[in-house]
């Protein structure tokens, strides 16, 4: 029954995120907000909303280790698992010359996350700084996408537009829009509660840590919106969108959600996460370097298969309770 409730939690959570995105997009359109801004804010928030709500719920429920595992695990899964699957569907190329700037921000944010974690704690001051970086990045992204920054626009705005147009079934009246938003938040709340309660029970029944459940099962589940968005983008051959979804979501997870966790309550960092999982996370980001700078023309099926193999090795390392990155490398 626990597993049924866990799966039900995933379904309700993802359904809530979908309803929230559709309702929020409709609400934004009613205020004549451009598709560009909608795509860069509402859609980006929608794909990361499961991580956000699950992490907040876990933190206030007294299991912050599950929240931490969810965030770090999602960032690893987004790159190795989701880009791996997307690359198998269609070779992913970074054609947008400005996308490397987002990769630099992600690398900086990931490095800052590790530095802040060296004292095994993300506190209020760390949270303030991360949220400040998030706000600056959002303002910069808007100015770049709107063409206010010369030579740094998005190239074309079909990326955000195509995501907005993809939402064909939209609430038509303001009442339905409010209902969609309300039901979306309700679905996120109920789904996250089911995920956390049953995820913790499963962890305890197998005598494994809550952070391990967060790094694997919960992380993969909350990354499903990114899988759907990047998978569809790869199928439609919109390769920049596949890269952009992952990089943007990972930035949001670190500077947005981790920052918020620091503001709500200090986030404790277990030694194993600091000595192993965070290094896997930053190494995954570095793996994107040759693709972002176009030293390698694209993430084809060979590299996609390598990404998936690395993710399987990472899951194996968690299952065998590898304590740090040096043990992992020596055992390969």
Show the residue positions of the predicted features:
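Hydrophobic alpha-helical segments, chiefly the membrane-spanning helices
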Residues: 1-332
